Design a protein with these regions (language model features):
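Domain-scale activation on soluble regions of proteins
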Residues: 1-345
């Protein structure tokens, strides 16, 4: 990160997510290679879901693992440590839970040590996939920590775990996912389009979800009702449960300010289209469905067009969020003035 605080605090989350997702794909590829019965593979995937420890356990029951005793022992410890923190594969995708922050608030995640350990785990998966040693991402070091979370005693070049009492936790994720997707799309020319298309599209899909969910947390008079907030805030359904519940607040404040609301209908159609393609937020995460059928077989994808399409949806959500921040400030000022007026009388 060259000690860039934005990258250290914000890019760290999407980067770690992509490595974790790469490990999940690698272990699932191993399972597909070790088992010929389609229904058995499907059942393992359904039972284990995103749990890397369980998936690796299922893989080792089906084959002789090509690892040394040290590599095997280290890997099992690392996966167990990872799953204690991120069993659902959402730790790096959404704002940190209050319980986690209660334990780790104001601490620093050691980016280098955590990255080296996850790279080593990925390298072990590559060895199981029988990728030649010279082409693997990392070589094994028995002295490397098998702890998933590793902490530093300073913030220089590390990730600061901090959230203000009034914050909703979305800012660093939105910025991190947005800039990471832009970096992959615009600057990583050494990576082929085929290799980076799914990471970019998933980053953008998650970014749009974050943009919609962030509006749920706005404490404004005509915001999302509390019962809807409690029941829908963790949904992955972009159109049905996220957009449809933030549209009324967008429309209300746009009308109140005399703005043209026709763009709201345009964005709604775009979100509907994206939801038809990726209803549950997994179409860009996995190459196949649970029935093991390829989702994008022999399809020529215009990455630039899709990137701009998805970025436009997020830009609209981001603009709405800025407006709602201004509304929240104005409403807060009005409440204070009214309170002072009542006190005067």
């Amino acid at each position: 990160t060259n000690h860039d605080n934005i990258k250290s605090d914000m890019w760290f989350f999407p980067t770690m997510y992509l490595f974790r997702q790469g490990m999940e794909l690698g272990i699932k590829a191993l399972i597909c290679g070790a088992i010929s019965e389609k229904r058995k593979i499907q059942q393992i995937f359904l039972d284990c879901k995103h749990d890397l420890y369980m998936l690796f356990d299922a893989y080792e029951r089906e084959t002789v693992i090509l690892l040394t005793e040290e590599e095997y022992g280290w890997m099992k410890k690392y996966l167990h440590s990872l799953e204690e923190v991120d069993a659902k594969s959402d730790f790096f995708r959404f704002p940190l839970e209050d319980e986690f922050l209660l334990n780790y608030q104001n601490k620093f995640l050691d980016i280098v040590d955590m990255a080296n350990s996850i790279l080593q785990a990925y390298g072990i998966i590559q060895k199981c996939l029988e990728i030649p040693e010279e082409n693997r991402i990392d070589r094994f070091d028995a002295m490397r920590s098998s702890d998933f979370l590793q902490f530093a005693n300073h913030g220089f070049g590390n990730c600061y775990l901090w959230e203000s009492i009034t914050g909703d936790g979305f800012h660093k994720l939105v910025l991190g996912y947005s800039q990471s997707a832009e970096f992959l799309f615009c600057e990583c020319d050494e990576i082929s389009k085929e290799e980076k298309v799914f990471p970019i599209l998933f980053l953008l899909r998650n970014l749009i979800e974050l943009g919609l969910k962030r509006m749920f947390y706005k404490t404004i008079e005509h915001g999302v009702p509390q019962n809807v907030f409690r029941s829908k805030r963790k949904s992955h359904l972009l159109y049905k449960e996220l957009w449809k519940n933030v549209r009324p607040m967008i429309e209300y404040y746009a009308n109140a300010q005399g703005q043209d609301i026709s763009i709201i209908n345009i964005v709604e159609k775009q979100i509907q289209e994206l939801s038809c393609i990726d209803k549950n937020g997994d179409i860009f995460r996995y190459p196949t469905s649970y029935s093991l059928e390829y989702r994008f077989d022999n399809i020529d994808l215009d990455l630039k067009n899709v990137y701009e399409f998805m970025q436009a949806i997020f830009n609209f959500c981001d603009g709405c969020d800025c407006e709602f921040e201004s509304v929240a400030d104005w409403e807060s000022d009005m409440m204070q003035e009214m309170a002072q007026y009542q006190d005067w009388y």
